Amino acid sequence: MESAGKHWGAWEGARAPRHREEGGAPETPGMREPGGPRTAVTFRALLGTRSEASEAEEELSVPVALGGMFKNVAAICLHLVGPLRGKKTGASLTQCFHQTLTMAKRLQARRLDGIDYNPWVEFIKLSSEDDIVNLGQGFPDFPPPAFAVEAFQHAVSGDFMLNQYTTAFGYPPLTRILASFFGKLLGQEINPRKNVLVTVGAYGALFTAFQALVDEGDEVIIIEPFFDCYEPMTLMAGGRPVFVSLKPSPTRDGELDSCSDWQLDPVELASKFTSRTKALILNTPSNPLGKVFSRAELELVASLCQQHDVVCIADEVYQWLVYDGYQHVSIASLPGMWDRTLTIGSAGKTFSATGWKVGWVLGPGRLLKHLHTVHQNSIFHCPTQAQAAVAESFEWEQLHFGQPSSYFVQFQQASQRSRDHVMRSLQSVGLRPIIPQGSYFLITDISELKSKMPDLPGATDEPYDSRFVKWMIKNKGLGAIPVSIFYSAPHRKHFDHYIRICFVKDESTLQAMDKKLQKWKDELGP
């Protein structure tokens, strides 16, 4: 009790009756006049005995002051600890005060309101069970190319200084090769110090861009379906998402639909631009649809961005995965667009090493300098060894680029074969895949199975595709992602008859998928 004795004078002073300067009743211990100084809560007044108050003080160490939202803290504390009078206080009293403080303070920042629930957690957990073929998550389940693995091994076992910090905005050999490689593709003279920022994955690049450019009340145009982080990142920056949907053309009898049939309405898109529009985010090839925006579509977007002085955030992480002879065009390469475009890339998607978490942003210095500020004061630095491995991998690819030995060429060819395999297999059970032009993904229409399906469990307000995926995981052993989560809340009900499949998987995974689909087909009967 030595600690209690040492501080008892402070407690006594806190509880001593004090009179207003002009006379009047003494204040209740713990009372706080509006705008006045905080007053310690008096345990002796609350509990009645010096020993009990000393024990409470010894546990809590300092007087407890609650926020100004309560005019009479003592009255509230008396209500909480009333049942403890005459009893040993201990942890119970602490718990009471912790509960009171919890009620008095808001812990969650308001910018997280409405975005604290993430459906991915649930679907990933369901798909991680044994014997589930996980076609939901977007990562390859096969090794990166041998040259990339060797590059990482060199980085880990070679120069010991690669264990230390490097330049905050990017490991110099990496920023140089990115500037050289993409400068030729974009037709720009890219300065590796001013026009390149290396980030913790493309996710980090997106977050940094939103934080650097989007202010309170700014509007960001998002094209639906969209990679799901675009909306919460806009909200966390204080912006307002403005959605515009790609509209599918009517289905053609006997033919599979293509994602090229999903188009923007030029009039609707133009109507979304206002004086408050700060940015438009463009994902091509897109996730989840796999759409590769045509040059004509990009020119429409570019003209509107220039007309309204809007920044384009171009998420191009799947640029090397384009199928059936389609061509990826970077919007930054169009006339007048380099100076207002941030182009985002991913080493994980480029070299099939998503766990490396190395991404980058390319853009004009007038924009990049603001991303540098955010990066410097948040992430500061990305792992040096991973950056060194990516730099060496790009150097290898640059020597083979455009040749049959190029990894980009070989990976694209293998991914197209996997895409075709998965589409044939899905059709065998009555699903109608939408042919993707690029990316890791395809979406498939599940409408035709509705008549053959049992009533699916789940809440009545839960989108149909969400209930379908849960049923499919549990009953068919196949994991996928409902497409409705890639839409804003008002539009989900219009697109809840699609699911997303990742087809960039190992051959053994695709064979396991085939077995489960064949069993499903047998159960459906003729």
Protein language model annotation of sequence segments:
Residues 100, 110-201, 208, 393-396, ...:
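N-terminal small-domain helix-loop-helix segment of the aminotransferase-like
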Residues 130, 237, 307-308, 429, ...:
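Helix C-cap/helix->beta junction micro-motif
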Residues 8-11:
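Tryptophan (W) side chains
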Residues 143, 409-416, 420, 428-476, ...:
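Conserved PLP-binding catalytic core of the aspartate aminotransferase-like
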Residues 69, 162-303, 320-338, 462-463:
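Conserved core of the PLP fold type I
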